[in-house]
Regions:
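Short, structural beta-strand-to-alpha-helix junction motif
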Residues: 36-37, 79, 178
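Structured surface interface patches that mediate subunit assembly and partner/cofactor docking
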Residues: 2-7, 24-27, 50-66, 82, ...
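An N-terminal domain-cap segment
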Residues: 2-56
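Short, charged, amphipathic alpha-helices and their helix-cap/turn boundaries
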Residues: 10-19, 75-86
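Generic alpha-helical scaffold signal
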Residues: 11, 31-34, 74-77, 101-104
Length: 214
């Protein structure tokens, strides 16, 4: 898929998330523990516009604490509609060239974080292009987020597709699902994703409960 198509899909997810945020309001729950829709909006604004906060999203300790404080402050002090308007305006000029690879997964996940924070959610349909765009990120992203899963040979597959190895060695398990569902599962939203795990029952249980993330 071209970079231009990837960027278009990222922009579509951005717009859909902005519409949803305004629809549910700042106090709506999300799948991110402790975060309301206002925290989500603040996070997305700061992530693209504040390098000091961006570092805290990948580095632990004081960096992470600084990012958490900045997010809490923005969520509480900046009007919600203004935060959403900043998100909708798109990324700053310096990062527009990497909008697709930088943002397509981010905005898909956070849109679903808001959508799936209710008991009656269902997967979106008609997302073939988006699913195709998310698939190339699965191997590297899943490998990174499962680095603390030990002694497991992990494969992933789309429904009806050929499995792809993510981690080799150890006891084998295969995760099967649409790329969007695999994304949600390995971003830690396991209870709010539709992924089938096949393999030894003990290994399947391990993958379902093992720590996942950065």
């Amino acid at each position: 898929m071209s970079a231009g198509m990837s960027a278009q899909l990222a922009q579509a997810e951005r717009a859909a998330l902005c519409d949803l945020l305004l629809d549910v309001g700042p106090d709506a729950p999300t799948l991110c523990e402790g975060w309301t829709a206002a925290h989500m909006a603040a996070h997305l604004v700061l992530r693209e516009r504040r390098l000091d906060v961006g570092l805290g999203l990948v580095l632990p300790g004081p960096f992470a604490r600084h990012a958490a404080r900045a997010t809490e402050r923005a969520a509480g002090q900046v009007p919600f509609e203004r935060l959403v308007a900043r998100i909708r305006s798109g990324p700053p000029r310096l990062i527009r060239l990497v909008d697709g690879p930088m943002n397509i997964v981010e905005f898909f996940v956070h849109l679903e974080d808001v959508r799936r924070a209710t008991d009656d959610w269902t997967p979106r349909t008609g997302l073939d292009d988006l699913q195709d765009a998310l698939w190339p990120f699965q191997k590297s992203g899943t490998k990174l987020r499962t680095r603390r899963v030990k002694d497991v040979e992990l494969w992933i597959a789309r429904p009806g597709g050929e499995p792809m190895a993510v981690r080799t060695g150890g006891r084998q398990v295969t995760a099967i699902g649409d790329p969007g569902e695999l994304t949600m599962f390995f971003f830690g939203r396991r209870d709010q994703s539709r992924v089938e795990l096949t393999g030894d029952p003990d290994v399947v249980a391990e993958v379902r409960s093992a720590p996942i993330g950065f």
